[in-house]
């Protein structure tokens, strides 16, 4: 006799943009859950329904169900008369904060960067919205211990204890591409991100004044006023050792990691921080700020900027490169081992264990 169905809805609307962290998180989680869906139905009677953009109906196969939504319908879907045992809201910024007919609404919190990026009335508005979302959630998960501590220090999360489930990282070691169109020689320092101001990219650009024998390659969105300001500084200082690139493919990204000398990530606000771990998967040294979640994610095998003075940062890079490349084989293997502890398979397994725990209540 078939087990009674236990219905779990998972919000995956942001798979429409895999070039940002939320899109990649939702795509990888959805893929891993779909891969296990048939077994979970047989063993536990679980039936997944994925909430996705219409054009992604069917993209995770036939062992899961789908609800198609649009940007406009995200606010009203919470009221559809469909029962779910669990509705997993996969990040705190979505307009879908809960499902009215779900027995348990589970929300994953990725960061509260607005606490550091907003001020005045805008900050107070964001705080009220987030506090309301926390209150509506029956259970919480966080993508790092830092995020959990940060949220609990600013907001009332009682009586929910919450748990930490780390994101996975995609191993790009088997991904290959062609970067010849960029005309870049091997052995550069590398940074890739959204290039928002919080990524602190201007610091590593300014640092290059003190590393005239090194080259820096920066990849991301070059269309912002922030980047225009950085380009103006590059011209003012006459820096010829900084290259900025836009619109790289996943294959090109992997190749840019592969051919770099080191990865630099002096970010001010990170809930997790995928790019440093992507670089570590390819055996590269990473240089990180000591802020937010980066010490937690980078671990003992990362190098850290003790302060963000450009001259001191340059010294940290010089000393770190000398240390890493004094024993490159052993050092590369150590960072690979660390990165390999963050897998999407383990991430999905942790969420499944939580789903089973919530279903048993």
Feature map (PLM): residue ranges:
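Carbohydrate transferase catalytic cores enriched for Leloir-type hexosyltransferases
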Residues: 1-361
């Amino acid at each position: 006799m078939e087990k009674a169905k236990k219905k779990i809805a998972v919000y995956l609307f942001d798979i429409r943009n895999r070039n940002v962290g939320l899109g990649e998180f939702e795509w990888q989680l959805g893929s891993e859950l779909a891969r296990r869906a048939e077994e979970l139905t047989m063993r536990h009677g679980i039936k997944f329904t994925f909430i996705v953009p219409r054009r992604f109906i069917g993209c995770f196969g036939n062992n899961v169900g789908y609800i198609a939504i649009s940007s406009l319908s995200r606010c009203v879907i919470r009221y559809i008369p469909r029962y779910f045992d669990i509705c997993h809201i996969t990040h705190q910024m979505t307009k879908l904060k809960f499902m009215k007919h779900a027995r348990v609404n589970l929300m994953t919190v990725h960061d509260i960067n607005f606490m550091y990026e907003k001020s005045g009335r805008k900050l107070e508005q964001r705080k009220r919205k987030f506090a309301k979302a926390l209150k509506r959630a029956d259970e919480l998960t966080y993508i790092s211990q830092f995020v959990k501590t940060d949220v609990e220090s600013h907001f009332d999360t009682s009586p929910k204890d919450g748990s930490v489930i780390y994101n996975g990282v995609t191993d790009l070691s088997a991904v290959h591409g062609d970067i010849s169109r960029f005309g870049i020689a091997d052995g550069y320092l590398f940074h890739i991100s959204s290039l928002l101001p919080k990524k602190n990219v201007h610091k590593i650009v300014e640092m290059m004044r003190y590393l005239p024998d090194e080259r820096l390659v920066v990849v991301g969105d070059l269309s912002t006023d922030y980047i225009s300001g950085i380009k103006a500084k590059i011209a003012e200082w006459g820096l010829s050792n900084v290259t900025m690139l836009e619109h790289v493919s996943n294959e090109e990204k992997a190749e840019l990691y592969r051919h770099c000398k080191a990865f630099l990530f002096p970010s001010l606000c990170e809930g997790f921080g995928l790019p440093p771990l992507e670089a570590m998967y390819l055996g590269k040294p990473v240089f990180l700020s000591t802020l937010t979640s980066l010490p937690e994610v980078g671990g003992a095998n990362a190098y850290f900027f003790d302060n963000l003075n450009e001259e001191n940062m340059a010294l940290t890079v010089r000393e770190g490169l000398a240390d890493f490349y004094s024993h490159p084989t052993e050092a590369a293997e150590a960072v690979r081992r660390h990165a390999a502890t963050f897998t999407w398979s383990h991430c999905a397994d942790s969420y499944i264990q939580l789903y089973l725990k919530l279903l048993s209540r």
